[in-house]
Structure formats: C-alpha cells, structure tokens
Curated annotation (Swiss-Prot):
A matching Pfam family: eIF2A
GO terms, biological process: negative regulation of translation; translational initiation
Family of the protein in this entry: Belongs to the WD repeat EIF2A family.
Name of the featured protein: Eukaryotic translation initiation factor 2A
UniProt signal peptide: none
Length: 642
C-alpha cells in the first residue's frame, strides 16, 4: 500500500493514493462547509467539524463513520500523539459563564455503528475561553495528561483500563513554582518512553529567564536534570528530539536593541541529558550562530544532529551535534526552511515566503551532496511523504488566494503529480499506523481501530510505503503533469528537476549586453546589413578625421583626371562647412523597441534583487511576470536576442 494524502476545500475532503497511481480513494462531501479538519498522528482517524456536528472517520480509506457528536460551533480539533483522545473546542457561550467548551473524547474502544454522542460521554471537559493553547498535553503513548492551573502543572496517569482518569484534584504528580516570583509560561513533555518535562520562565524584574528539564516522578516534582539561565528572553519555542533526551529552545525578545530586526532578537539554547531521568547527568549550552534572526531549526530523525538556518539574507545553514559543535556548514544562500526526511537520509532546504521558492535536496549519507534542485514558487505547505521518497508542496488559502493547488515531487527533483484548485484550504500526508490494530469480530461494532499492543511494528512498514527509484528514467510521471505544463508553458523549466530555465539561443546575457558587438537590428533589414551610424556624421564619412581628409583628396584627384587627362591636377578644395547632416527621424518601430528594452532592463534588475532575497512589492512581482510578453513584442518588431 502506498502513502496517502488528503486535500480539504471549502466543500469537501478528498483522499488520494500516492505514487504511482494517484487515484482518488474517497470524497467526503458535506451539506455544510467544513469548519475544521485534522488527521490523527497515528493515521487511524480523520475528524472534521461542521456547523452542527463533529464526525470521526476510520478505515483504510477513512470512509467509515466511527462516531458522530452533536456539537455546534466547534472551531478547533486536536488529537493526542497516539490518537487515543480527540479534543474539541467550541465557541464559549455568552449566556452560560460556566460553559465547559472543551471536551476530550476517548476513541481507542469499540463503537456501535452509527454511534452518536448521546450514547457516550466525554472523558473530560473544562473551560478554555482562549483558542491559544487550549488543549491538554499528552505523552507519546497517551499514558500521561498535563494541564496548567495558574502556577501548578498537574499530571494525571492514564491507561486503557482507566482512560477517563482526568482527576486533576488528586493528580499523579505536581510541578509547582509558587516559591518564586517568576512563573513558567511554556512547558513541553518529551516524546520518550519515560518522559521528562521542560519548562520556560521569561525574565522579569531584572531576573534572568530560566530553562529547566524536570524528571517526572510521582508526587511533587523537585528533581532538575538540566537548567540554563539567560537574559533577552520574553518568549520561546521548544522542540524535543525524537528520543526525548535533548531539547532546543529558541529564546525571542519582543524588540531588537540594535534596531536591525523588526521581529526582535533570537538566541538558541541546547539542553541534553543521558540515562533515564538524567541519571547520567545533563548539559546545557548556547548554540553559536551567525548574527541575525533564526529562520528555522529542526532535529534529525536520528536525534543525534540538528540543523539551523540563521543570519541576515543570504542566510548561513549549519548542522550541529548533541554537544552544540558544528558538524557541517553550507555556503550562504537565500533559504529559510529545513526539513529532514523521515529516515534522515535526505535534507530539504528551501526559500519560501517572500523568497523565490528554490528547493535543494541534500544527501546526508553522502557528505551533504546536493542531489537535485527544483523551483516551487508561492509554496505555503511543504512536507515529506511518510516513506521519505516524495515531497508535497502546496499553495493554500487564505495565505495565497491565487494558483491554489498541490504538487508531488520525487526526491530526484522531478514533478510527478499536480492538481489545481480554485480554493485549497489544507493538505497533509496520512501517517502510517506503527502499531497493530484489532480485527472486527462483531458486525455491529467497529473494532479495527483499537490498539492493545503498543510495541511498534518493524521500521520496514514505513519504508515500504514509497518505492525506491534509483534510475530517473524509470520514474512514472502522472498525466496531470503534462496537462499542467501545456496550460502553463512558462513553468516547464521549474518541473524538470534542475531548477534552471534553459533558453534556446546560447548562453544568457543581461539586456544591457545583448547587443554588444553587433549592429542595430532594423525591421525588414537582414541581420548584419545595418551599419552603426554616428549622430551628426556625414553619411559615408569615417569617424577618423585623417582618413576623411585623404579620401577627399583622392576623390578630387580622380574626378579631375577623368574630366581632363592632360591637365594638371588642381589643388583639392577645402572641406565644405555646410556638409549635409543626417536629419532622418527615428521610426515608430525603433521608439517602441527602445521602450521595450527599457522595460526589460528594469525586469532584470528586479529579478537580481529577488535572487538575493530582497522582498518585492506585489506590483514588482507582477512586472517580472510580464517578461515573456515583452520578449514576444520585441520579436514581433524584428528585435533579436544575440
């Protein structure tokens, strides 16, 4: 079975098989627009909300309705890491101040077919008026649940036998910061089998910010595994590595004291430890980066390295080990996105957003060698396939309301599938389920979504999703690509895997150098027949003054010898001061050519600015897109690119 991906529009949700067929597996059309939709990280469920209800789908093609909940105005959905819990956020009621607008539903159990919410009750419900950070945090296997109560972080222990044990009044563990005037604002549980918790406390009243990793144990949590104190930190972003033994913290200030950045200053810190709950010690370092903003930072799936894109454009791209030492650096380039493939074999670096959309694929196992390049302009979503052989790029609304669609690329840089939409809202790959599920034994119940054994399946299950194609000629290109190229011929070069536009007619020359060494191209005159003229120079005269004098004498002598062969040659007459001048006016065609060449030079200047990462106005981007039309107009007027 190949990978699957889903596409959400304002009217329906479509599920597609990936390479090589790209067949549409299922379409869930609704009478009402879909407000929110999300795939579970485990790949077992698809949840979507409308104005009147919330539905959960399951099955190989996500076409079986597992559960229908009669909830109105659900604007956000969230799955736990293992997919056992679905959280729904409703708009808070104005009439009822005690309205519990967040409900947590347990899904890893049998459900009657055509089950509705009247038959079940949520495992937990509470009030969260803000839509920011409203959901509970869960550990990797959903065996711990976390919720922050003012200054206390309370943890409950969960299991399949006690799935609704959300008793935060008698929690399994408590992490409190009542003893200090500073209180942590951000926390994140690690994805390890024996999880730990990282907390961030911003600086306040002259006291430095704190970053601490805590060991999770029953009762009051007091053991610190690793910690780091620093200034210049109003907020932060936390990212654990997949093994859960190291975390990156991007500290952010609201203002840049040097006034070089509108978005504040960035500093990156690394905390790591060894052994269960840090029994072998911890370590904390500040990662040394180039001056400037941090555009992206991400962990390798191996958990042994991480990559950072930082600095003013063109940015510096570096890779580090768990000690914070530089392993490898790439030349500076206009890039702001980095993504490791699921196996860690390939690394994608790209320049999206206000950059030109160039993408490079590096081979981590071959000394970071560049495997392929391609252009994916206007990309708002970029993700690796679960098998690690294909890349999805998409343009979605409301980020961009034009050229909406999805493209699938092979790691070799070849475009293999395209689908365009008038309005595309969301795209995502469906993750494979890494655990064994039960089989249906009772026709009246759904049971094939239940996981009882939490031992992961072999890694070969994920890697077999995408075929390994070493020879590019064996790659099967979907018919949609040819249709796309025929409709957009100017974009053909961006889908050929080399990321460069090849022009017929020799090497590229900038507009100001295209006519160097050649005469003027005059409409209707063969190339090379037109000669250069100097304004104010007598036709037929040379620009060399001495040569003109000799030619005058030679013509006078020849004329006198022809009229009177026996007569003595008369002295040559002085040059006439009233020589005729070239008063011929410039033709309308030449004026038009000059105007078009001026536009071409301006377009070339804008393209050079765009190539180095400068942000262009919308009108300037539109002007670049008129280059092809300008060249066609010049060709019609007889101008040729030499």
């Amino acid at each position: 079975m190949s990978s699957q991906f889903f596409l959400k529009t304002s009217q329906d949700i479509e599920l597609f098989q990936s390479y090589p067929t790209f067949e549409q597996s299922n379409t869930n059309s609704k009478d009402f627009p879909v407000i929110s939709s999300v795939l579970s990280p485990c790949g077992r469920f698809l949840a979507l909300s409308t104005k009147e209800n919330v539905k959960v789908f399951t099955g190989p093609c996500l076409d079986n309705v597992l559960l229908t909940m009669k909830l109105s105005d659900v604007y956000d959905l969230h799955f736990s890491p293992a997919g056992n819990y679905l959280s729904t956020w409703e708009r808070a009621s104005i009439q009822d101040p005690n309205h519990k607008n967040v409900k947590v539903w347990y899904l890893n159990k049998p459900f009657k077919k055509d089950c509705v919410s009247e038959d079940i009750v949520p495992a937990y419900e509470y009030q969260a008026k803000s839509q920011s950070g409203w959901f509970l945090q869960f550990s990797k296997l959903d065996n711990y649940g976390l919720r922050l109560f003012k200054h206390d972080l309370k943890i409950v222990k969960l299991s399949s036998a006690n799935a609704d044990n959300f008793d935060f009044q008698s929690p399994f563990a408590v992490l409190s910061d009542d003893e200090t005037s500073q209180h942590f604002t951000t926390y994140l549980i690690s994805p390890a089998e024996h999880p730990t918790i990282c907390t961030f406390t911003p600086e306040k009243g002259g006291k430095p910010a704190q970053l601490i990793i805590w060991a999770l144990s029953e009762g009051k949590i007091t053991k610190k595994i690793a910690s780091k104190t620093f200034f210049k930190a109003d907020s932060c972003q936390l990212k654990w590595n997949p093994l859960g033994n190291a975390i990156l913290c991007l500290a952010i200030t609201d203002f840049d004291s040097s006034n070089k950045s509108y978005y504040g200053e960035n500093t990156l810190y690394l905390l790591s430890f060894q052994g269960v709950n840090g029994t072998l010690g911890g370590n904390s370092v500040r990662v040394s980066l180039t001056t400037g903003p941090v555009h992206d930072f991400t962990w390798s799936p191996t958990s042994r390295q991480f990559g950072v894109i930082a600095g003013y454009m063109p940015a510096t791209i570096s890779f580090f080990d768990l000690r914070g030492n530089v392993v490898h650096s790439l030349p500076q380039q206009a890039k702001n996105t980095m993504l490791f493939s699921p196996s860690g074999h390939y690394i994608l670096i790209a320049g999206f957003g206000n950059l030109q959309g160039s993408v490079e694929i590096l081979d981590r196992l071959d000394k970071f060698k560049c495997v392929s390049k391609f252009d994916a302009t206007n990309t708002s979503v970029c993700k690796w396939s679960p098998g690690g052989e294909f890349i999805m790029t998409a343009t979605t609304s409301p980020r961009l309301r034009v050229d909406n669609g999805v493209k699938i690329w092979h790691v070799s840089g070849s475009l293999v599938f395209v689908k365009e939409f008038k309005e595309l809202l969301k795209v995502d790959w469906r993750s494979p389920c890494n655990y064994k599920t039960l089989e249906n034994k009772d026709e009246a119940f759904f049971e094939n979504h239940i996981i009882n054994n939490w031992e992961p399946l072999p890694d070969s299950t994920t890697s077999s999703l995408d075929p390994k194609i070493s020879n590019k000629s064996e790659l099967q290109i979907h018919s949609s690509v040819q249709e796309y190229i025929s409709q957009h011929p100017s974009r053909e070069a961006s889908s050929n895997g080399n990321g460069s536009k090849a022009k017929a007619g020799g090497a590229y020359k900038p507009p100001h150098a295209r006519r160097t060494g050649g005469g003027r191209i005059v409409p209707g005159v063969p190339p090379g027949a037109a000669k250069k003229t100097i304004p104010g120079l007598v036709p037929g005269m040379s620009a060399n003054k001495d040569a003109n004098t000799k030619n005058r004498r030679r013509r006078a002598n020849k004329k006198s010898s022809e009229t009177s062969p026996d007569s003595t040659p008369a002295p040559s007459a002085p040059a006439s001061t009233n020589a005729p001048t070239n008063n011929k006016e410039t033709s309308p065609e030449e004026k038009k050519i000059r105007s078009l060449l001026k536009k071409l030079r301006a377009i070339e200047t804008l393209k050079e600015r765009q190539a180095v990462g400068d942000k262009l106005e919308d009108t300037q981007v539109l002007k670049i897109q008129t280059e092809e039309k300008v060249l066609k107009d010049l060709e019609k007027l007889g101008w040729k690119d030499e």
